[in-house]
């Protein structure tokens, strides 16, 4: 059991640590605007916040941390901003992977990665290769990821198996569909997020893990992502500890 001490030294027991946490990292642009800085500086500050949250989650015993780094819809942003965002994984992996590796963190990526710029793709591959034997927290980047597209592709794969008589339609189950999703590379028990956190005060999923989040608990906070640090993660988990997960039962 972990004990989280608030600033007033009130001890809060953390009986339940969510095995899989998903984070929609939102508010980088607004963070920069409040400080009269370019939007790209918010993304850079968000990168530093991610490193702190990852190490904190690892220390708490979280098994998987899936972070929404770039959606399939984000390509519609201004070209200069997209170019900067695409360079962030290169900078993040080069700067922080040695520390992640030291903390036994394994880097993994889901999404349509073949459409990424070569430098981004290569940096991602280097990080995954360097940490592939680590057995601690899985830092799972959703990069050029879209939930509807993921489900559509799973349906296409299953339909093709039926067309080729490799699969009987009566044998299609939820587990079979899940096995065709990108999260099938995660440990079986931890594929679905127990807790999804969204920063910046927005109250929507934005196409993030729609299948996997069917029974997730949600935590929405007005805190902008660059300001979401270790203490904010603890607050989210304290809130999670006050929930009773029913999974559809009474």
From Swiss-Prot:
Binding locations of Mg(2+): 26, 217
EC number: 2.5.1.-
Keyword terms, alphabetized: Magnesium, Metal-binding, Transferase
Enzyme class, first EC level, given as a word: transferase
GO biological process, one term: polyprenol biosynthetic process
Annotated binding of substrate, by residue: 27-31, 39, 43, 71-73, 75, 77, 198, 204-206
CDD domains to which the protein is assigned, alphabetical: Cis_IPPS
Catalytic residues in the record: 26, 74 (proton acceptor)
Entry-linked InterPro entries: UPP_synth-like, UPP_synth-like_CS, UPP_synth-like_sf
Cofactor annotation remark: Binds 2 magnesium ions per subunit.
Highest taxon, organism lineage: Bacteria
CC cofactor: Mg(2+)
GO cellular component, one term: cytosol
PROSITE patterns cross-referenced by the UniProt entry: UPP_SYNTHASE
Listed NCBIfam families: PRK14830.1, uppS
Homology family: Belongs to the UPP synthase family.
Known role: Catalyzes the condensation of isopentenyl diphosphate (IPP) with allylic pyrophosphates generating different type of terpenoids.
Quaternary state and interactors: Homodimer.
Stated name of the protein: Isoprenyl transferase
Organism from which the protein derives: Streptococcus agalactiae serotype III (strain NEM316)
Classification lineage: Bacteria, Bacillati, Bacillota, Bacilli, Lactobacillales
């Amino acid at each position: 059991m972990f004990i989280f001490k608030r600033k007033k030294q009130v001890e809060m027991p953390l009986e339940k640590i969510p095995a899989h946490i998903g984070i929609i990292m939102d508010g980088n642009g607004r963070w920069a605007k409040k400080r009269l800085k370019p939007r790209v500086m918010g993304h850079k500050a968000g990168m530093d916040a991610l490193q702190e949250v990852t190490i904190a989650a690892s220390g708490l015993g979280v098994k998987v941390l899936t972070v929404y780094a770039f959606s399939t819809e984000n390509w519609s942003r201004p070209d200069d901003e997209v170019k900067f965002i695409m360079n962030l994984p290169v900078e993040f992996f080069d700067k922080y992977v040695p520390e992640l590796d030291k903390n036994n963190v394994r880097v993994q990526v889901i999404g349509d990665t073949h459409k990424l710029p070569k430098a981004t793709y290569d940096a991602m591959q280097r990080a995954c290769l360097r940490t592939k034997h680590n057995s601690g927290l899985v830092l799972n980047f959703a990069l050029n990821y879209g939930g509807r597209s993921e489900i559509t592709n799973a349906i296409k794969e299953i339909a093709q198996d039926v067309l080729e008589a490799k699969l009987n339609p009566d044998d299609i189950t939820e587990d079979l569909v899940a096995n065709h999703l990108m999260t099938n590379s995660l440990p079986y028990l931890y594929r679905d997020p127990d807790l999804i956190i969204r920063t910046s005060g927005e109250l929507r999923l934005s196409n993030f893990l729609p299948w996997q989040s069917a029974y997730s608990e949600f935590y929405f906070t007005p805190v902008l992502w660059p300001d979401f640090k270790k203490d904010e993660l603890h607050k989210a988990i304290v809130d999670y500890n006050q929930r009773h997960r029913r999974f559809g039962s009474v």
